[in-house]
Regions:
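Active-site-proximal specificity loops/subdomain of glycosyltransferases
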Residues: 1-41
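Loop/turn elements at helix/coil->beta-strand transitions in domains of secreted/extracellular proteins
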Residues: 3-5, 40, 71-74, 138-140
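Short, solvent-exposed loop/turn segments at secondary-structure junctions
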Residues: 13-14, 50-51, 81-84, 105, ...
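Short beta-strand-to-loop acidic/aromatic patch adjacent to the donor-nucleotide binding site
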Residues: 39-51
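A structural signal for short, well-ordered beta-strand segments and their strand-loop junctions
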Residues: 45, 75-77, 109, 142-146
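Conserved catalytic core of nucleotide-sugar-dependent glycosyltransferases
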Residues: 53-129
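C-terminal catalytic/acceptor-binding lobe
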Residues: 121-279
Length: 279
């Protein structure tokens, strides 16, 4: 509901004149003001250069109980870094929701309990990278849709200088007016782990060459040694982002990244024993 709308003005009087410092000051001010109202249980953050899907608010309404009720949750995000049209099947993935160890941002929701922890130590710059650091994340997860509920309309501009414009411009934005989201497998970390381990154990291990040649079928597992360099080499061959923050590949959960290659679901995975030990 937008019945209570208030404009917050922040005089730009802080130290540091570049975009990263200004953004951090802006977010601190806006979140502080929003949570100053005792009735605010959670806040959705939406930047001005994002287009939202028709079911954007429906997604956050669906995952709000998970964000509120599970201490293993850091935030919810409307964004999937691997949500390019070549990596998702909209018809099959439209209602799917996953946990991730990676904070994607670009339309996200934060609960009061997390803000009360992070607000007093909010950084002067690079707030998103700071939030991804182990000291802040503390092994907590982000819940996000497989099909993005936001689209970056200025992918060649902004503080990143268009660094990822090729990936951002190919993102698929949901056009669904109303979606019944499947949140059963993300209600707890135990449920998410059970789904992941069952999926990994059932998937045959194949070489990426088989996937690229079109001979793989169904859901397959392509293993890497757990290092980011090994992951990045596979990601590049699949046309995925070969990028990490604080040691976590974009979109990963326990080191596993799921992508589609045509009709095939590809699980880029460390050795199974390492996945089970990951925290």
């Amino acid at each position: 509901s937008l019945e209570r709308t208030r404009v917050v003005t922040q005089p730009d009087d802080g130290k540091g004149g570049d975009g990263y410092h200004r953004l951090a000051r802006h977010f601190r001010k806006a979140l502080t003001e929003a949570f100053a109202d005792a009735r605010t249980a959670r806040v959705i953050v939406l930047e001005e250069d994002l287009e939202v899907a028709p079911d954007f608010f429906g997604f956050f309404a669906a995952v709000a109980p998970v964000v509120d009720g599970d201490a293993s949750m850091l935030a919810a995000s409307a964004w999937n870094d691997n949500g390019q049209r070549r990596h998702v099947d909209v018809a099959k993935d439209i209602a799917r929701v996953e946990r991730s160890d990676f904070f994607g941002g670009l339309g996200w929701m934060l609960a009061r309990r997390v803000w009360e922890e992070l607000g007093p130590k909010w950084p002067d710059a690079y707030w998103d990278d700071w939030l991804r650091e182990p000291e802040q994340r503390r092994n907590r997860h982000v819940v996000r849709p497989v099909v993005c509920r936001t689209f970056h309309v200025k992918s060649t501009r902004g503080t990143s200088g268009g660094q990822y414009s090729h990936f951002l411009s190919d993102i698929v934005l949901s056009q669904s007016a109303s979606t019944v989201f499947d949140v059963d497998d993300v209600r707890s970390s135990a449920a998410a782990d059970a789904r992941l381990f069952a999926q990994l154990e059932a998937a045959p291990r194949v070489d990426l060459g088989e996937v690229l040649a079109g001979s793989a079928r169904g859901t397959v597992r392509v293993e890497y040694d757990g290092s980011f360099a090994a992951y990045a080499a596979l990601a590049r061959r699949l046309g995925a982002m070969d990028n990490e923050k604080a040691g976590v590949p974009r979109g990963a959960y326990r080191g596993v990244v799921e992508l589609r290659r045509g009709p095939v679901i590809v699980l880029l995975s460390p050795p199974l024993g390492r996945v089970r030990r990951a925290r």
